[in-house]
């Protein structure tokens, strides 16, 4: 059977693009990698976007979805960013009835996980 999730395609593109853009922006390895997984759950799907970049400190994980929060306010302007991207991502996911969280290990990478409810299963 096929799994169907009802979502605004443009909004979901923003979510995926923002997360991948952050992964690329903070990649500090020449052999950088981004993996995307879609996990089929009973009544939802879970999407995971994982990189092997510099990671996020545990103390910052609960705050990265806050508007204007930056894990390192002293970053140089070459990395850019205003600190609103992940707050927008969170709002879009929540507006679609889902939720998002991150796991990370400094020096090893970050994984963004988000869950969206299934609409139906088609045979």
Cite the ranges covered by each PLM segment.
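Acidic ATP/Mg2+-coordinating residue in the GHKL
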Residues: 51
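Short beta-strand/loop element within the Bergerat-fold HATPase_c
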Residues: 33-43
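Short conserved segment of the HATPase_c
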Residues: 56-68
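Conserved glycine-rich
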Residues: 97-98
């Amino acid at each position: 059977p096929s799994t169907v999730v009802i979502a605004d395609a443009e909004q979901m593109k923003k979510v995926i693009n923002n997360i991948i853009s952050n992964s690329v922006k903070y990649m500090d390895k020449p052999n950088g990698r981004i993996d995307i997984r879609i996990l089929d759950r009973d009544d939802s799907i879970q999407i995971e976007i994982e990189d092997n970049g510099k990671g996020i400190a545990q103390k910052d994980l609960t705050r990265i979805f806050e508007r204007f929060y930056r894990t390192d306010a002293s970053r140089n302007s070459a990395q850019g960013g205003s600190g609103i991207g992940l707050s927008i991502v969170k709002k879009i996911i929540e507006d679609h009835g889902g939720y998002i969280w991150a796991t990370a290990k400094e020096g090893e990478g970050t994984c963004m996980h988000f869950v969206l409810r299934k609409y139906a299963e088609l045979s």
